Amino acid sequence: KETATDYELDADIAYHDLQAKYIVSVPKHIAVKDKGGKVYRERSTQINGNGDITNITMHNGDKPSVYDMTYDAYGNLASLTKPENHKGQRMRYNYTYDDVLHTLVTSVKDAYGYTSSTVYDYKWAVPLETSDLNGNKMRYTYDGMGRPSTILAPKELESGRPYTLKFEYHPAERYAR
């Protein structure tokens, strides 16, 4: 319950039942109402057998907004399709993950074919280089403890500068105790 100035709202939440898999906290339906029963927000979800949300429907009057998701064999989000726009078109994003850890997003491709990508340092699971949909690159370096050392943005990369941001740590290469 949330109370604000002159009105009180209740959030009624129902959950999907996957107790056999110990999944008990995935919301199935939520409705936010005032004391008189007027609904201010309402959403519902559908899930797959793993408890992954495959569909979110936001009930906004007569035309609901629908999000659809798919997952890969590792349980990572493989695609996200957003609600229709005014022309009935839906934007879709496809996600690709690394072949080593199967957890780091290496590329995102949208419905227009635009792609952004990331190359990682697997020791720290941090980006070494990113490339946006326009081909602009950023590069990152890290110290021996996985902390950022330098960040090189597109403008400085193009002009041959050594960094855009540089970090120093004192004392260097030591863990806090």
For each of these PLM feature ranges, what is it?
Residues 1-177:
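Acidic, low-complexity segments
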